Every structure is written in C-alpha cells, then in structure tokens.
Amino acid sequence: MSNNQSRYENRDKRRKANLVLNILIAIVSILIVVVAANLFINSPSSKDVSKDSETAQKQESPASGKTEKKSDEDIKDSKKDTSDSEKDSEKSSDSDSKKDDSSSKKDDSDSDSSSDSAGDGLKDAKVTEGGSSSDVEKTYENPDWKAVGTEQTGEHAATYDSSSQDWAEMLKAISYATGVSTDNMTVLWLGNNGSPQDAKGKILDKATGNKYQVTITWVDEKGWKPTKVEKLK
C-alpha cells in the first residue's frame, strides 16, 4: 500500500514539474514571438529608407548649393579686388609717367630758356656788324632800354667793389641788356668808362660761351642804364 502511494506521489510530482516546465516554455515562446513581431513591425522598410536618404540628400543639397554660391561670390570678390588693385596700379603708373613727362618737359623748357637767355635782352635791339674794335663781332643798341632802378640814395659815384651795392646794380644792368642772368655769367672785367657815372664790363655767358662787352651809364635816382652791347669774337 505504501509503495503504491509513494509511486503515485512521485508520478504526480513529475506531472506537475512537466506542467510547470511546459508553461515556462510556452511563456518563453510567446515572448520570443512578441519580440520578433515588434522587431519586424518597427524595422524601416526599404521605401522608408529610400525616402529618408532622399530627404537627407535634399537637405544637404541646398547647403552644398549655398557653399558653391558662396565660393562663386568669393571668387568674384577676389577677381574684383585684383581688378581694383590693377586699376590702382595703372593709375599710379600713369600718374608717375605724367609727372616724369612734366618734369622732363620742365627741364627741357629750362634748358631752352637758358640757351635762349642771351638773346632775350637783345631781341629788339638794332644790330650792326663790327664795333668799336676789331675784336667786336656785332653791336646792339636799343633806345628803349631803361634804367634798372637803385636802392642807393644821395650823391652817386661808381664803386667797383664786388661786395658793394653799386657793383650788384651794375651787374643787374648788364644782365638786363644781354639777357644773361647774374648766376649764369662770369665777370671778366668791370670798371670805369671815362667818368664816375659811366662804366663798362665784359662778361662770359656760361651756357653758350659767348662774350659780351656792355656799356652802362648812371641815371640819377633811377640807377644804371645800358646804352650799348657788343658781342665779342
């Protein structure tokens, strides 16, 4: 009796254990199915993936377009800056060229003026060949020559001191008659011409090499006045 009861109990326990095990297996299987179903349902389809890819490309495309547009603008700005720089350089070069041309013309003008200076004072003078001596090539006389003015006052007497005011005014009269500036002349001789109010000087024009002998006379309160110029041989 006891053996039958013991076998019965063991069989019952095994049956219960199998039941529990089957239940657990069923639960696990259900969970697996549920999880698999969720994964399958939630996984993106190929169409969705394609749409997402297209959307991403569209979003990136404007950015790329903006980048390309910005790059083009940068290139245009760079070209504009380069063009402006070249224009400024050309303007500066043209300006420098004009300045150089102007300076060159001025130098040429000064040179021409220096070359022609000896003729300016003699332009309207009456010219005769020869003169008071054999070494005179031409004689110039002009009744329109004026006294050159003076800063001296009182009674006048010619002074042949190269540092005196009278000497400076005599050279001024010689320069006026010949057209040779005092800076461009070499005084070969300057002295009395027969009276305290008459003088004569010989000069060399540094620019042309011409020599002139000039006769001058004193006019009260008006200074020295040239009366005759002789070009020497």
UniProtKB/Swiss-Prot annotation:
Q: What species does this protein belong to?
A: Bacillus subtilis (strain 168)
Highest taxon listed in the record's lineage: Bacteria
Keyword line: Cell membrane, Membrane, Transmembrane, Transmembrane helix
Q: What is its main location?
A: membrane
Q: Which GO terms describe its cellular component?
A: plasma membrane
Q: What is the lineage of its organism?
A: Bacteria, Bacillati, Bacillota, Bacilli, Bacillales
Q: Where in the cell is it found?
A: Cell membrane
Q: Which residues form the signal peptide?
A: none
Question: Which is an annotated Pfam family here?
Answer: DUF1510
Q: Where is the composition biased (Basic and acidic residues)?
A: 48-57, 66-108, 135-144
Topology relative to the membrane, per the entry? Answer: Single-pass membrane protein
Transmembrane ranges? Answer: 21-41
**Family matches, as InterPro entries:** DUF1510 (IPR009988)
Residues annotated as region Disordered?
A: 44-163
Q: What is this protein called?
A: Uncharacterized membrane protein YrrS
Q: Does the keyword Transcription regulation apply?
A: no
